[in-house]
Amino acid sequence: MRFSFLSGIRDLFRHFIISAASGALSDRLGWVWGAIAKVFSGSVWLRYKIAKPPHQVQATVVSVGNIVVGGTGKTPLVLWLAQALNERGISCAVLSRGYKGKCSQRKSFTIVDPALHTAACVGDEPLLLAKHLPAGTVRIQKDRKALAEKSAGAFDVLLLDDGFQCNRLHKDVEIVLVNGSDPFGGRAFFPKGRLRDFPERLAKANYVIVNGKCSPSDQRELDLLNPAAKILVEPQISEIVWLNKSANMPRDHWEGLGVGVFCGLGFPKGFLTMLRNAGIHVLGTHLLPDHSGITKQELELFCKKIILRQGVGILCTEKDSVKIEAFAEEMSLPIGEVRMRFSCVCNEERMVAMLDAIEAIQKNKKVTT
């Protein structure tokens, strides 16, 4: 009960600060953000100091996380990992808190079913993952330790979504993503910067995946923190699916496409850069706080604005599209869901080695249990 209550208060406070820090008050209250950042960093330090030994479960636990508030590409990586391990005959469950989903408040876990659940119920990211993964494999509950205990007997591998700060559960493999353009979250704790953890903790990761181009100085610093585990990837568009046309857009039509873009991401700059790198002309944006949804009225107003700028459609991420399915077909412009994939810039063999290592740990754990 105490765990659930404190988590609820923390999430409510975090959502308020994110909304305020991204709005007009941000510049005026810099000193307030600095003071709160000191309190936040102190609470993070204390949490690690008083942490009890982590609980071990029967299955292999692979954590995918980050050290900043949102926006590093965890969800596409979790999806890729689950699919890659499934191809090797390894059964996987994705364990998520179901952030901002009403079902996450329940004492028992919820198996995410796209045919039954909405993003408001289970959270946008779990719903997105459940659409692409085998039925019954995406599960949400705030208490991931309890969720892991209930799921361990049914799966070979448990993928812990956003698990780097989860101290209550033993993790066999730690994968941490960082944004190449800002790997250290502005070098300040949230809300003054975007850090939610100490950069020094990257040394504890088995693999650090750098999403996007990184400056030479940041690369050197990452190498000092964790020299052996770095993997460089670039986000790329795999396809664009028009929700209200039920059709894919051919790749050769992307160049010069004039569109509006809306998204609720922790780091929208990365998404916009990827679109521009593909030759897409962004005529206007409607940016929302991470995990926030756009209303039907807001989206239609944005469509009309883009029509005046001679735009031919509106693009959003998969995470955003799951929140507008009920009214996407009613909009005055086509709505395009941008699907992404990671492309290895270098060290591709490390991605394969990472999968090999997870498989080896899983097989060894299976023999010893």
Swiss-Prot record:
Pathway: Glycolipid biosynthesis; lipid IV(A) biosynthesis; lipid IV(A) from (3R)-3-hydroxytetradecanoyl-[acyl-carrier-protein] and UDP-N-acetyl-alpha-D-glucosamine: step 6/6. It comes from the Bacteria. Its EC number is 2.7.1.130. Keywords: ATP-binding, Kinase, Lipid A biosynthesis, Lipid biosynthesis, Lipid metabolism, Nucleotide-binding, Transferase. InterPro entries: LpxK, P-loop_NTPase. GO terms for molecular function: ATP binding; tetraacyldisaccharide 4'-kinase activity. NCBIfam families: lpxK. This is Tetraacyldisaccharide 4'-kinase. It comes from Chlamydia muridarum (strain MoPn / Nigg). The gene is lpxK.
